[in-house]
């Protein structure tokens, strides 16, 4: 099969290697400053391919531009989409509604690999492991015996809380959802309500947020040595400006898999794309 990889970070470079190892042909566009794996080809042309692969996220910090940190210039993602023939298969991650609309007008088969269960579950596991590593590197004490609050009890929050408990950290879970709090307690974790007394929050050595909205009732209650770790995408759930005013250390770490374990993250994209291809009858 012929693949065209467009933009992206280390994850898509490792993905290119995996696709080559499968016996495919791989061309790379908007990766002009990257060292490609042996066998991959740089291209300046947006040629048609059996499968076009966009990065995760597909768009850069400026809406409408391609996420292409290894390219010397900016690229319009809409111009890129418009260059492909109708019916072309295009796979990308975290695709915006506007991007979907543009693909639909062009009659492209746009597929979001980030939305697939095999990706989301694996990505949560990699994120949780990366968060534990980041926490261990930045805490001024061992995880053993530390009091850690995990905000949110979704896929990432659940895996993270149980990894921390396995390392003998005193692990607390804050959730607005009473069922999630009950589930956390049934699994041997401490559950905290957003309406809990401020004194509860004064004991934490670290607070890790996985929720998209701000739910820390009172940052003033946290002790000065408390480490804040933000895993949610912008705007996140931690008021970083307020944290700075209070003298609290805050580390923003969205997209952790791409930084902590790009090979594992590439493997998840690889698996998702192979499954998409099977469903699209390309394999």
Residue ranges and their predicted role:
Residues 3-14, 19, 144-164:
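Glycine-rich adenosine-cofactor-binding loop
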Residues 94-111, 232-277:
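Rossmann-fold NAD(P)-binding glycine/threonine-rich loop
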Residues 54-144, 253, 272:
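Glycine/serine-rich phosphate-binding loop and adjoining beta1-alpha1 elements at the start
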Residues 3-43:
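N-terminal glycine-/charge-rich "phosphate-binding" loop or analogous flexible N-terminal tail
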Residues 57-59, 73-84, 184-258:
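Rossmann-like adenosine-cofactor binding region
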Residues 50-51, 89, 147, 205-206, ...:
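Structural motif
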Residues 22-37, 167-187:
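NAD(P)-binding Rossmann-fold cofactor-contacting core
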Residues 9, 30-32, 96, 176-177, ...:
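Residues in the short beta-alpha loop(s) of Rossmann-like NAD(P)-binding domains
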């Amino acid at each position: 099969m012929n693949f065209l990889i467009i933009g992206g970070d280390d994850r898509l470079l490792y993905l290119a290697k995996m696709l080559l190892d499968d016996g495919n042909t791989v061309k790379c566009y908007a990766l002009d400053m990257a060292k490609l794996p042996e066998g991959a080809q740089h291209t300046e042309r947006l040629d048609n391919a059996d499968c076009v692969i966009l990065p995760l996220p597909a768009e850069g910090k400026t809406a409408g531009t391609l996420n292409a940190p290894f390219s010397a210039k900016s690229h319009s993602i809409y111009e890129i989409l418009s260059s492909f023939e109708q019916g072309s298969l295009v796979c990308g991650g975290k695709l915006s509604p506007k991007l979907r609309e543009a693909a639909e007008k062009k009659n492209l088969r746009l597929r979001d690999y980030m939305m697939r269960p095999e990706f989301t579950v694996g990505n949560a596991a990699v994120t949780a492991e990366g968060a534990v590593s980041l926490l261990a590197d930045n805490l001024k004490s061992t995880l053993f015996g530390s009091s850690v609050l995990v905000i949110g009890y979704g896929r990432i929050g659940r895996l993270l809380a149980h990894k921390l408990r396995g390392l003998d950290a005193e692990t607390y879970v804050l959730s607005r959802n009473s069922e999630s709090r009950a589930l956390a307690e049934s699994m041997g974790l401490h559950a905290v309500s957003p309406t809990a007394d401020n004194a509860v929050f004064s004991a934490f050595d670290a607070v890790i947020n996985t929720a998209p909205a701000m739910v820390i009732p009172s940052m003033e209650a946290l002790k000065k040595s408390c480490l804040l770790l933000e895993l949610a995408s912008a705007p996140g759930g931690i008021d970083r400006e307020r944290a700075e005013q209070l003298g609290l250390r805050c580390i923003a770490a969205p997209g952790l898999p791409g930084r902590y374990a790009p090979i594992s993250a590439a493997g998840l994209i690889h698996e998702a794309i192979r499954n998409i291809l099977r469903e699209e009858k390309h394999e």
